[in-house]
A protein has these predicted regions:
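Extended terminal
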Residues: 2-21, 62-63, 198-202, 206, ...
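Short, surface-exposed coil-to-beta transition loops
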Residues: 93-95, 220-224, 285
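Small-residue helix/turn framework positions
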Residues: 110-120, 134-275
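N-terminal mature-domain "stem" immediately C-terminal to a signal peptide or N-terminal signal-anchor/transmembrane
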Residues: 32-36, 45-66
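Hydrophobic residues embedded in beta-strands of well-ordered beta-sheets
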Residues: 73, 110, 235, 296-297
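N-terminal beta-strand/beta-hairpin edge segment
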Residues: 54-166, 212
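N-terminal type II signal-anchor transmembrane helix
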Residues: 5-46
């Protein structure tokens, strides 16, 4: 019986043996290719961290594991930390284990997953503000510029995001869904240095917010817009936003003591007029322009907040 099996193997046509040999060679070659990319992926992460550190950021993370063979390159990074200190403000982010994935044949397109606890601290001369966030799911897709290691396109999808304390008193401690699609236009900047960002701005570079949707507490906000840099390299922006649930939001602000009952009544009257009675299947709809100028956020002509001061690294 053993002799018959060996004879059968010997009698296989040469083309079949050639095909088997090709398959084995391709498999071995792909294995070498994957391992090479895994090393490059890990080295690329280290180079990215080194560049950010040179720009003045603090970058730290725990053990790094690379897995996913054969169809994925998957990096799992423990205890990531990213922070930046400046004269006017400092900020710090600490996140849960971060998983970064890419297809071996499409390494400039990555996906990151970071469900769990995120701790963000922003320190200014006036106050320290902390956001303690727990994300049920948080997925980020990035398309990278090979020359700079900076993203050209970003998509963010988050669900079931809760906060230890409400980001805005009276509007609840849970974001049901969050989505963002943004693209960088113009020649991609090669670094985040002040001189480079100034040149990118002068060449007409912008960040286009293709879509933004947030469902938080009683409100749903969606819209699009453009972000650019002003003469001091601070963000300026113009958005067209649609807001639903604004009446319930005013009630929440009043109940939390953020606004007085009389002011709440006036706000409701103004919002009713601005909405013009417009409604769709989801309820009353308020279309309002939102802008950022001189670090101040405006909703129409009304000041609603401030944006952090951007400290760009000096040099190129």
């Amino acid at each position: 019986m053993e002799f018959t099996q060996k004879s059968g193997l010997r009698k296989l046509p040469r083309p079949v043996w050639g095909l088997v040999a090709c398959i084995l060679l391709v498999a071995a070659g792909y294995g070498l290719y994957w391992n090479f990319l895994a090393g490059q992926f890990r080295n690329g992460l280290e180079r990215w961290a080194e560049v950010r550190r040179a720009e003045g950021y603090k970058v730290d993370y725990g053990p790094v594991e690379v897995a996913g063979f054969p169809f994925w390159l998957r990096v799992v990074m423990g205890q990531p930390v990213l922070s930046k200190s400046g004269e006017k403000q400092s900020w710090n982010w600490r996140g849960p284990a971060l998983t970064i994935s890419a297809r071996p044949w499409r390494v400039t397109h990555t996906k990151a997953q970071a469900p769990g606890r995120h701790l963000v601290t922003v320190t200014t001369q006036a106050r320290v503000r902390t956001l303690d966030i727990n994300a049920g799911s948080l997925n980020v897709s990035l398309k990278w510029a090979v020359s700079s290691g900076l993203p050209l396109e970003m998509r963010i999808e988050g669900k079931d995001i809760s906060y230890r304390s409400a980001p805005v008193a009276g509007l609840g401690r849970r974001t049901e869904t969050l989505s963002l699609h943004a693209e960088v236009t113009g020649t991609p900047p090669k670094s985040l240095g002040a001189a480079v960002m100034s040149q990118w701005r002068d060449d007409g570079g912008t960040v286009e917010i293709r879509s933004l949707n947030v469902r938080h507490g009683p409100m749903e906000i969606d819209g699009d817009g453009t972000i650019a840099l002003d003469g001091d390299l601070q963000p300026q922006a113009a958005f067209s936003m649609g807001v639903r649930g604004f009446m319930d939001a005013v009630d929440g602000l009043q109940a939390a003591g953020v606004i007085k009952p009389r002011k709440a009544d006036v706000m409701k009257m103004v919002l009713a007029v601005l909405s013009g009675g417009k409604a769709d299947a989801k309820g009353k709809l308020l279309k309002v322009p939102v802008s950022i100028q001189d670090e101040i956020i405006y909703m129409g002509p009304v000041v609603v907040g401030r944006v952090p001061y951007m400290n760009w690294p000096t040099g190129g």
